[in-house]
């Protein structure tokens, strides 16, 4: 019997779409996923469970699912023993403290305050580490309205852009945790399942690396190639092809997204012309 890898992902919410997209970018075809609790892949030994995000760490720890995609904030709040094997780069946010925008935030401001949150364990850990005594009010949603209705002076909630805080007259004052989607696994997987995890991880890392890089093609005079090579390390070294016009070559290489615009300006200054930039779908290294 062919072993299948069981992965748990969020059934709805902010991580669902990106999780499905990641699997598709990894070349994994899923059967109909709409309004399903479980589905399978037709071209990879993978079974997908659609769960509440709060339940994913427990399912992975108990071995009901072999791996899962979940936010760090949820994993750490639940204090589960699932092992993080890859940060996925989406669903980025931070768990932060916020107060009334007109209040001055000073040392010991939190002492004795009422704090509303959906993350009591992470908040309590932060308070203990900083020797702060405060009253935690656990609520399941719409945390940002707590100060406005007199429930708390402070909130501890997830923040992405900060627009929700702004609309509710709040300002961010402390970051407790930087979070993003992570791939986690059960710590007791057998050899066969570990091999499947590694195959999937290889695909995920190839997709991630491709997103961080661009394929670049340019034309340059031969007497400027040495300068251009210094700017284009590529994966090993740039590919150089002679052009029909004597004294010119076509140079192909890979540029990191982080330094892309700076390098383009330097390449133009070094004599590069006709620069083309192409997205990379997969990058195998």
Place the predicted regions along the sequence by residue.
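Small-molecule-sensing regulatory modules
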Residues: 2-45, 70-94, 101-285
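Active-site-flanking structural segment that lines cofactor/substrate pockets
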Residues: 40-58
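Pocket-flanking alpha-helical
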Residues: 54-59, 64-80
């Amino acid at each position: 019997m062919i072993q299948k890898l069981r992965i748990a992902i969020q059934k709805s919410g902010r991580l669902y779409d990106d999780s499905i997209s990641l699997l598709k970018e990894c070349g994994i075809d899923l059967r109909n996923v709409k309004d399903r609790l479980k589905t399978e892949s037709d071209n990879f030994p993978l079974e997908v469970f659609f769960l509440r995000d709060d339940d994913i760490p427990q399912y992975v720890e108990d071995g009901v699912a072999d791996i899962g995609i979940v936010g760090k904030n949820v994993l750490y709040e639940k204090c589960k023993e699932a092992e993080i094997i890859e940060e996925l780069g989406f669903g980025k946010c931070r768990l932060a403290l916020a107060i009334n925008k007109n209040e001055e935030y000073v040392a010991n401001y939190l002492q004795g305050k009422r704090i509303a949150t959906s993350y009591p364990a992470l908040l309590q850990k932060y308070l203990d580490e900083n020797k702060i005594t405060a009253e935690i009010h656990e609520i399941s949603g719409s945390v940002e309205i707590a100060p406005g209705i007199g429930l708390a002076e402070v909130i501890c909630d997830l923040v992405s852009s900060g627009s929700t805080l702004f609309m509710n007259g709040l300002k961010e004052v402390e970051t407790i945790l930087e979070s993003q989607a992570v791939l986690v696994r059960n710590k007791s997987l057998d050899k066969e399942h570990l091999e499947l995890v590694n195959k999937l991880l290889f695909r995920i890392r190839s997709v991630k690396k491709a997103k961080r890089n661009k394929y670049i093609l340019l034309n340059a005079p031969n007497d400027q190639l040495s300068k251009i090579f210094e700017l284009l390390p590529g994966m090993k070294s740039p590919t150089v092809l002679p052009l029909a016009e004597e004294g010119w070559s076509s140079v192909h290489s890979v540029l990191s997204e982080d330094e892309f615009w700076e390098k383009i300006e330097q390449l133009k200054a070094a004599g590069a012309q006709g620069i083309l930039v192409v997205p990379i779908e997969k990058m195998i290294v």
